[in-house]
Amino acid sequence: MKFEAILFDCDGVLVDSEPITNGVLCTMLNEAGWAISPEECMRVFIGKTVRSEAARIEAHTGRPLTDAWMAQFYDRRNARLEAELRAIEGAGDAVLAVHARLGGRIACASGADRFKVEMQLEKVGLAPYFADRIFSGHEMPATKPAPDVYLAAAAAVGVAPARCLVVEDTVTGVAAGVAAGATVVGYSPSPVGHGSPEALRAAGAVHVMADMGELLALLG
């Protein structure tokens, strides 16, 4: 199939933010009384919003997940992202190449909050290529694995979801792209990324890349 647009996830696809965000979250959960390891924290929260796991957090900490706690999390997370964030290897070149090939018909469709997504894309120099085609699941009726954010992104680039290629690194994200009616490719660098190739394929990815350099060839 010849694709007419590419819709990118952000975290773990364009920017290497997950270890940073997970580190802050793990530290704060331990401070709140949940003795969770970094590995378990990544497994539980990858591809999800913190608030979507509020019941689990409250069960382990014995206290409600408050707006004040979330505000502190955002502040600490953003400070570390500003200081440490880097682009995924090869993501910059891939975005430039597909942007040129597709006449700018690319979008970023993230499950994260808009401030985080826009800040990250600015920091790694990719924001100009997405311009006003940046979408946050926080602003949709439902976030990933619901298809809403991908449906909004497809509408913004003026391409039917069935003619869009989605790039995702988590099972939750792959499910969202599939539910939108798009073709989804996974990204799982070696050693294994945030979703194993097997798990991404089981969720509906038709192909799993280990290198962003593969993306241009997948356009058809």
Predicted segments, located by residue:
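Asp-based, Mg2+/Mn2+-dependent phosphohydrolase catalytic module
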Residues: 1-4, 96, 102, 113-220
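Conserved G/P- and acidic residue-centered "switch" motifs that form tight phosphate/ATP-binding loops
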Residues: 9, 13, 110, 169
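Conserved SAM-binding loop
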Residues: 14, 87, 106, 166-167
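A metal-dependent, Asp-based hydrolase signature
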Residues: 46-80, 89, 97, 105
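Active-site neighborhood of HAD-like aspartate-dependent phosphohydrolases
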Residues: 1-43, 60
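Short, acidic loop-to-helix structural element flanking the phosphoryl-transfer center
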Residues: 79-108, 114, 118
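An amphipathic alpha-helix signature
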Residues: 22, 26, 50-55, 70, ...
